[in-house]
Amino acid sequence: MATAAGVDAALVHHYFGTKQQLFAAAIHVAVDPMDIIAPMREAPVEELGVQLPTALLALWDSELGPRLIATVRSLLSGDGVTFVRSFFEDMVTAELGSRVDSPPGTGRIRAQFVASQLIGVAMARYIVKMEPFASLPAEQIVQTIAPNLQRYLTGELPKGLAP
């Protein structure tokens, strides 16, 4: 990220600390991404399909939601896409992928399938505001998508995706 910005990586680390802290500072939201990711480390893998959307929808529906929406719109309209991709690759895929890497070598694609579903939910519900989806209670969305998320995380993968 530092290279893309044309600055010394040591300075970025000095002023912002971790990549998570840099991401939080860059999007100007008073939430540390690790506050969202850390509880997922404690959750049993068999419950992540429910835990992930529950946590993310609660965040988006909180008082921080409008700022998150504005930030996402801004990031998607410029060079921020690379930054968001880097965050997902370094944080979400690495954190989640290492927990669901069975058979070995599938953790990354499993985490990316989950991320694609959750990004789609956020886009449809908060950015594009597709009705009636945008107005559904969060719990209904969680109950509907959790089985698919869990299948991505722990289910059998189609031929060609597993090594």
Predicted segments, located by residue:
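Helix-turn-helix
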Residues: 1-21, 25
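Short helix-capping/turn signature of helix-turn-helix
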Residues: 16, 73-78
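Short, basic, alpha-helical segments at the C-terminal edge of helix-turn-helix-like DNA-binding modules
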Residues: 28-33
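Hydrophobic alpha-helical connector segments
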Residues: 35-72
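Short alpha-helical scaffolding segments that buttress acidic/His motifs in well-ordered protein cores
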Residues: 56, 68-75, 114-118, 122
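Short alpha-helix boundary/capping elements
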Residues: 60, 64, 76-80, 92, ...
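Hydrophobic/aromatic-rich alpha-helical bundle segments in the mid-to-C-terminal region
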Residues: 81-86, 99-152, 156-163
